[in-house]
Amino acid sequence: MSERKLFTSESVSEGHPDKIADQISDAILDAILAEDPEAHVAAETCVYTGSVHVFGEISTTAYIDINRVVRDTIAEIGYTEAEYGFSAESVGVHPSLVEQSGDIAQGVNEALESREGDTDDLSHIGAGDQGLMFGFAINETPELMPLPISLSHQLVRRLAELRKSGEISYLRPDAKSQVTVEYDEHDKPVRVDTVVISTQHDPEATNNQIRQDVIEKVIKAVIPADYLDDDTKFFINPTGRFVIGGPQGDSGLTGRKIIVDTYGGYSRHGGGAFSGKDATKVDRSASYAARYIAKNLVAAGLATKAEVQLAYAIGVAQPVSVRVDTFGTSTVPEAVLEAAVRQVFDLRPAGIIQMLDLKRPIYKQTAAYGHMGRTDIDLPWERLNKVDALVEAVKTVL
């Protein structure tokens, strides 16, 4: 009897309370970066029935209308009706942003290496905090992501498309998905075992109508037929009713969906959230760099699965550690891959910012449906432009 292994990941829609908060934080970040690319931003958002609180620390020369940014973001998501208990024009907006701590700023603005005489421009910026970050890639999907999180993202994105186009007129913005994939003894995905979808809806929509529409127009439109069989289980709005949703149903906070943002639990996570943070915060920029490295390693054929860990000390430019784990799938020793990575990628914060062009207002688009593995938008850390350099670097190390 072959061994049956299951793995589950989830995603949430742009209308989920925590994702509303993430999108508002990143919309504020983008608005500031559009005027001041050198800004330091840490913007947190809390949403609940009828209210939005924005708080955190910034250092910038920009002036932005936070009230307008918040309302426009909420409207774009789809909260435009008073009956939702949270609507763009009636919500109360309460900003409370203060200047970044001078103690932190002195280590970011001039790294330890620079203070000790290193004149390299890329050694000037220190990491905005200590911490560890992970990046991951696997050859399960064309975008080199784990299949469970890839399908979960596609399901909630499909729900949003059907809602915004009006094809399913009773849908409301809040939704969640969860996909359980069965793997064979070689860790290859063979079928989808279970799909869970909970979607907010107008009160007149019936459970039978929702179930039929979601299975036919969402699940079967997203999941390849080869992965579905008579034993695949569908749980559609299993509570029986989901009219009250969004911030009226649950409060939301920036940074509470870090597993949804990354690899669906398939890879380790350092614990730092992304949204609302400029690229001097290595929680964000180094996580993107680690994904960039892992994806190019797998695309280069140097491994079929790769997890990259980076770690930093606050106010220090160089990472304190770089680790590559290929789970026994690499074509060369992992120490060789680590040496090649250090040759090809400048992993100082300023090096990452330059390499990935991270001073641009590109972040709001990442705040829903995942920061990694996106095929619908052009993100620099998803590009496969380091494959040849890695292959050549491996040869020089060997």
Swiss-Prot record:
Cofactors named for this entry: Mg(2+); K(+)
EC number(s) recorded for this UniProt protein: 2.5.1.6
Residues reported to bind ATP: 16, 174-176, 241-242, 250, 256-257, 273, 277
Compartment annotation: Cytoplasm
Gene Ontology cellular-component terms listed: cytoplasm
Region feature Flexible loop, mapped onto this chain: 100-110
UniProt signal peptide: none
GO term, biological process aspect, one: S-adenosylmethionine biosynthetic process
Binding residues annotated for Mg(2+), in chain numbering: 18
Binding site for L-methionine: 57, 100, 250, 281
Pfam assignment, any one: S-AdoMet_synt_C
Predominant localisation class: cytoplasm
One Gene Ontology MF term: ATP binding
Pathway(s) it belongs to: Amino-acid biosynthesis; S-adenosyl-L-methionine biosynthesis; S-adenosyl-L-methionine from L-methionine: step 1/1
Domain of life, per lineage: Bacteria
Residues the entry annotates as binding K(+): 44
Keyword annotations of the record: ATP-binding, Cytoplasm, Magnesium, Metal-binding, Nucleotide-binding, One-carbon metabolism, Potassium, Transferase
Record-linked SUPFAM superfamilies: S-adenosylmethionine synthetase
Catalytic activity: L-methionine + ATP + H2O = S-adenosyl-L-methionine + phosphate + diphosphate
Cofactor binding description: Binds 2 divalent ions per subunit. Binds 1 potassium ion per subunit.
Role this protein plays: Catalyzes the formation of S-adenosylmethionine (AdoMet) from methionine and ATP. The overall synthetic reaction is composed of two sequential steps, AdoMet formation and the subsequent tripolyphosphate hydrolysis which occurs prior to release of AdoMet from the enzyme.
NCBIfam families from the UniProt entry: metK
Subunit: Homotetramer; dimer of dimers.
Family classification: Belongs to the AdoMet synthase family.
UniProt protein name: S-adenosylmethionine synthase
Species whose genome carries this gene: Streptococcus pyogenes serotype M6 (strain ATCC BAA-946 / MGAS10394)
Upper taxonomic lineage: Bacteria, Bacillati, Bacillota, Bacilli, Lactobacillales
